[in-house]
């Protein structure tokens, strides 16, 4: 099955390889939305790693900090990070625009944001128009929407990689003086819906 099982193991390894091919010295990392800590277990090239998730596992080591909390609009942390990593989180955020702006605030200048999101467009076209949108995935994320949200919140997409038909990996840089100019185009013809 392309959405469960071994696919997830392969996904995490591919995402780790994507990240380390770009930055092999992550320094100070915050991973947001990480209940299983599968990514952390694959890395050894960091100075400190903060896990932020309501169910984050606790580690008895000085350079790994677990924060059991949601990354919602009330969450507050004073630390700044070189790297933010999240996998299959963006589609779960209730306020993606505001929360991406918070990502930007958490990053040091020129910091890296690595995200993995489901390839909703593929699933919508090949399986069901609503596959991927449900009570946990409350809005539709395609490449155009993601580019728009990232640019609007001062992230410049440096690299993008499709992992099979399962996920899309993004590497973004924080850009403080970015001028965002993107038009959202209606890609769907709904004129025949009542025919």
Question: Where on the chain are the PLM-derived regions?
Answer:
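Conserved N-terminal segment of class I S-adenosyl-L-methionine
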Residues: 1-83, 87, 100, 168, ...
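A short glycine-rich, Lys/Arg-flanked "PGG" loop and its adjoining helix->strand segment in the class I
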Residues: 97-114
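Short, glycine-/aromatic-enriched active-site segment of Class I SAM-dependent methyltransferases
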Residues: 115-139, 143-145
